[in-house]
Every structure is written in structure tokens, then in C-alpha cells.
Amino acid sequence: MLTWYKSGTAQQKKTFWACYSGWALDSFDMQMFSFLLPALTVVWGLNKAEVGLLGTVALIVTAIGGWGAGILSDRYGRARILVLAIVWFTLFGVLAGFAQSYQQLLVFRTLQGLGFGGEWAVGAALMAEVIDPRHRGKAMGYVQSGFALGWALAVLVATLLLAWLPHDMAWRVAFWSGVIPATIVLFIRRHVKDSAVFERARQSRAPKASLASVLDRKYARSLTLSSVLVIGLQAGCYAILVWLPSLLNQRKVAAASMIVTVLIMAVGSFCGFVAAADLSDRIGRRPTLIGLAVCAWVVTAGYMFLPLNTGLATVLSFLVGFSAIGMFAALGPFLSEMFPTHVRTTCMGFAYNVGKSVGAGSVVGVGVLSTHIGLANAMGTFCLGAYAIAVFGILLLPETRGIAIETIGDADPTSDAPVVTTPSGTVTSAAAARP
């Protein structure tokens, strides 16, 4: 399973660790906040709608940040924009720790979200461009597993801070603690370079990426369906991640048991990332995503709607992490293979972050709906609808496994697959261009 890493070049390994650590940091900062929400609710007397807005606003503005970072990355390089993203969201995370009111915290979280948006699309594009097509799914899937590491660290740090410090101070220290991993990530990224694929594209006569790139009808089909797919995946994921601590608290789960439950889900997500990474290269991106989405639909329904004993809750927690979160390992390679190099991160950033911001509406939606039907029912309702939307998007997108990424040409608006230019001519099937 790790053959791809052992056979990789020094630059490929540096790129892997740079992207892995950055994604772990992104997850750490984002998930830390979800574990602080119960404390903030008590300290500032917030209602569920206000809590939902705090949880949603950073996710919504990631669309702007991701789109902007994608454009800058296509123009000025992947490596330097990855550094800028880390500095940006760490800075505003620190400032959030100094907030004196709900309104100030809302502003800092909004600005922090701009940095979050840039990390995923730019890192995914960089990885896609440096890794052998035969191993792209595995390598990018392992990068995605950094999310599980960041999540687990967030659980541990938040739990320790809330146990050792008064709640009105613990949440501030939690925001400030992001400086430590950010410094480590910046150290790792100091020698990472842009890919040869990107450099060749930048020196070619290909048109420069701009805000108008995502409006070009050549990319309309792939861009729209990719966004629909991400909306479904993110709506389900955030309905679970943001509200899970509150749900466990509502079910009177003891603090120690809550930590164990979330860690089991994080372990499940790591296993899901690894499995999805391997499967996406073995059987394809679409079958992997569809299978895990259906699995997520079933286990989420069980988790939210069934009366749970300890044993069943443990099993379902693992399976929710494995499917609902693990499936994201197949998303990075899938989207990176939809668009040509000169607009790759612009289009990926738009699809991923628009999908993320729209999908994040589930956080507010769950908060509002829970006042009428209860939190578990609200979470379950949004998750089931979300995964149905995701499957719809997947079914209408082409399979791209094994495609040589430098050969992807401009998409044909009338075709179901990207146009791929090969040494022998132009084909309209991604499968036909597999090495």
C-alpha cells in the first residue's frame, strides 16, 4: 500500500508532507471550534441560531477564499499560496482568541475562513501534479487522512483546556494554540516547489486564470456537477462534525465517554481515508464515492434515529467516520482530474468551496430545525438528504481514474467527459487516455 511513497522522489515526499501537515492543521483549527461551541454557548448565553451562525460563517466565506486562492495559485504558483493560506488563517485564529463580544468573534471567524478556503484546492492540485497517475488516488487519499490527525488532536487539546482552565479562558487559549502547529507546517513547507506540470503550463500560451474562468461554458458541466457533489458531501459532514459534541452533551454522555466516542469516529475516518485512497485507484473514483455515500446514508440514519446502547454506538461511530468522512479521500483526485492545469485550482477551488459554503448551510439549518423536531432528528434529516444529493452528482460525472493530468485539455460542453489531448490526437474519454 505504501509502494507509491517508497518509490517517490525527494520532492514528491516533501510535497506530500507539506500538504498532509497543512490539511491536519486546517482540520485542527476547524474542529477545535466545534468542541468550543458548548462552552461559548454557556459563557456568552448564545441561542442555537447564534451558535449555528458562528459555525457556518467561516465555512461560507471559504468559497471566496478558495476561489481567490485558486486564481492566485494558477497565476503565481501553488507553493507560495499554500504558505499564505497558513499565515492568514492562523493570524485571524489568534485574533479570534482576543474577541470581547459575539460580534467581534463573528468578524474574526469570517476573516479566518478566507484562509481555510485556500488550503484544500491548492494542496490537492499540487499533489495531483507531482504524483504518478497510477498512485494519485492513494497519495492524495493519504494526504486527506491528515484530517483525522487534526481532528484527534483538536479533541485532546480542547478536552484538556476545558478541564484545566475556566471556560471563559479555555476557548481563548484554544484559538491561540493554533500557532504551534502552524509554525511546524511553515517549517515543513519552506523547501516545497511548484510542479513541473504547472511550470510548463505557466510558460505556455494557455490563457491566464481569472474570475471569469469559472464562467467559461467549456467547464460548465464539470464545474456544476462537481459543486453539486461537494454540496452533498459537505452538508452531511458538517451536520455531523459541528453538532456532534452538542448531541452527545444532550444525550447526557459523560465527558470521558464523549472523548472516546469522538476519537473512535476519528479513527474510523482515518481507516476510511486509507480504504478510499486504495479503492479509488483500484476500482475507480465513482464506484468508491457511491459505495461510501450509500454506506454513510445507512449508518447515519442508524446513529441518529435508533436507540443506542454502548456497543452499537461504538460500532456506528466508527462506521460514520469511515464512510461520511473517509469518502473525501476520493474527492481530491476526482476533482483534480476534471480541469486543465492552467485553471485547475481556480475551478477546483470554486467547486469545492462553493459546495462547502452551500453545504455548510446545514449547520444553521440543523440549529433552526432542531428547535422543532429535536437535534438528532434534525441532524439525521439533513444528512440523509445530503448524501442523496451527492450520489446524484457522482452519477452524472465521468470516471477519471489513471488519467495523465498534463494531457487534460479544455472540456467539451456537449460531452459527458473531459476532452483529453494525447500524443496521437484528441479524445473525449478520460478512460481512453489512461496510461
Model regions and ranges:
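Cytosolic juxtamembrane N-terminal segment immediately preceding the first transmembrane helix
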Residues: 1-28
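Extracytoplasmic gate region of multi-pass secondary transporters
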Residues: 34, 219-273
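Helix-breaking motifs and short loop linkers at transmembrane-helix boundaries and internal kinks
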Residues: 45, 77, 98-104, 132, ...
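Conserved MFS/SLC helix-loop-helix module at the cytosolic interface between two early adjacent transmembrane helices
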Residues: 64-100
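Structural signature of the two symmetry-related core transmembrane helices
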Residues: 80-94, 287-302
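Cytoplasmic helix-loop-helix junction between adjacent transmembrane helices
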Residues: 108-145
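Glycine-rich segments within core transmembrane alpha-helices of 12-TM secondary carriers
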Residues: 137-158, 352-362
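Helix-loop-helix hairpin linking two adjacent transmembrane segments in secondary transporters
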Residues: 143-190
